Amino acid sequence: GSISLSLLVMQWLGVSAAVFTCSFGLVIGTLLLAGRDLKIALFSLSTAALAGAFNLHHAVTADTAYAEYLIGDVTLPGQVSPRAFWVNKSTASLLDDSEPPNYTRYIQHLRRVLRDELGFRDKAILVLGAGGFTLSHREPLNHYTYVDIDLAIKEIAEKHFLREAARGEFIADDARRFIATTARRFDAVVVDVYSSHTSIPSHLVTREFWAGTRRALKQDGILLINLILDGKLESPYARNLLATIESEYGRCAVEVLHKGKPISNVEVACFASSHPAPVGRYRDEKNQADLDKALR
């Protein structure tokens, strides 16, 4: 059952169909075991009807083996016909018809860092996690390569969300596999690999994964990471994840975009030239701050 669901139903009909198939199979099994018990039979049939109703009225733009995608209109002050790209019921991208278009705040932040602060022109930028392909939207100055595990995401985004061709190369592959096998080196690697609102696949948070991102960078390259953490960075997950990244890269810049909210986009920037180093603490009795400043 699990083999046929994963290889046949999920691949061809999507996750929702696989879940409904499991529910339907459980109902049939319950009816067979219940025999002539009318109460159990009615309960089973009601469950099947409820599951079917949810699936019939489930507003999904596309459903693949990896995710549910929904594109729909939203209301945002000051924007022209804004629309959202939801992945597994979580907002992945925003876009409107203004000139220039408006994007989600973290995408605006990343675009500003790359184009304005770093002055990137004619640079190679690797984006792990395609989202709505808005990082390169109408951005002809640099060369973008998107890597996403779902082959269908590009066509879905182009047809229903961007309503135009996505700018950049697209490679359907697992992010960790790609950085471990590619011979290419990039000026920037952007990591945005959420499978839902606050969930990163566990194999993409380890020190070994972050070491792999360094492998894909040029010597003077930069790693940019979009995280969703608690706004105060007090949770064990936030502390441990940031510590894991810095165990590979040394000190990184960390910016919380929504400081007044319990959950926030947190943007991390690490340079390939940086490495972990021993640290000291300045104390009244022993303070070498002036010496350290002279050695900058």
Feature locations, PLM:
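SAM/dcSAM-binding transferase cores
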Residues: L70, P262-R296
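A short acidic, Gly/Pro-enriched loop at the edge of an enzyme's catalytic core
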Residues: A180-V193
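Class I S-adenosylmethionine
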Residues: L45-V147, L151-L162, Y237, L241, ...
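A short glycine-rich, Lys/Arg-flanked "PGG" loop and its adjoining helix->strand segment in the class I
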Residues: V205-Q219
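Glycine/proline-centered helix-kink
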Residues: G1-S6
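Conserved SAM-binding strand-loop segment of SAM-dependent methyltransferases
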Residues: E164-A175
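Symmetry-related core transmembrane helices of the 12-TM Major Facilitator Superfamily/SLC fold
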Residues: V19-A48
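Conserved beta-strand signature within the Rossmann-like core of class I S-adenosyl-L-methionine
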Residues: D220-L227
